[in-house]
Amino acid sequence: MTTLPVLLVTGASRGLGRGVAVEAAAQGLSIAVNYASNREAAAETVALCRRAAPSGSQQFVAIAADIGRREDRQHLVDETLAAFGRIDALVNNAGIAPRVRADITEASEESFEEVLRTNLQGPYFLTQRVARHWLQERYPATLPGGFKIVYVTSISAATASVNRGDYCISKAGLAMASKLWAARLAAEGVQVLELRPGIMATDMTAGVKAKYDALIADGLVPQRRWGTPEDVGRAVRAILAGAFPFSTGEVIYLDGGFHISRL
């Protein structure tokens, strides 16, 4: 078993997950880089982690797994433990957008099932598997304040978009999952926090960049810029460093002030 803290990040081949992995590598953690299918992108994340790492003893392993599949979730945990012998933190980041942005009067059940399987069912039951491991093995945590679970949700958890209802519902459910696991695991030395990003510059939003450029310029985001993977990575880094020792089940907004009610 490694003596360094180990972070498992889902959906880490690109976007927000890559930002989280690279920041954690710079912090001195070893990392399991989960990806669904893009092996080359995952290898690039691993290379970036190695470049950022301050210690040659840190390890970085890419593990293919579709978290929407039960057997893949077990494989992901098994492979992480085989590589490192322990898990100290889990960042539930992996998620998908609907293939088609359809009005909720026309959206398909197939899209609903696909989005919720990956965005909600997957992280909920992956958390269950990791939590069971901690409760069974009872090894001491190496991170300040104990073990950590971070749910990366979205402003869509509380903001209605009628052309992607499945996505909004998945993120709203994930926000509740964070609270549920926080309540269940607090006494076990596990801190659970939700990060709620706003409009982020990633592959997922590339197709609507012009639309959101205009909205941001018009003041939709008070800080008047896009969020970045680095913004999310820095927030996770603070959590891993124990910056919020008396918090669990809380929401940390990373949205440039989008959530502020304004006149």
Where in the sequence are the language-model features?
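Conserved glycine-rich cofactor-binding loop
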Residues: 13-15
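Substrate-binding pocket helix/loop in short-chain dehydrogenase/reductase
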Residues: 101-104, 108-116, 217
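Residue(s) in the substrate-gating loop at a strand-loop-helix junction
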Residues: 154
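Short, small/polar-rich loop/turn modules that mediate ligand/substrate recognition or access, typified
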Residues: 186, 191, 247-249
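Short C-terminal tail/terminal secondary-structure segment
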Residues: 97, 101, 219, 237, ...
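Alpha-helical segment proximal to the catalytic Tyr-Lys
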Residues: 132, 182-184, 245
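Active-site helix of classical SDR
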Residues: 127, 170, 178
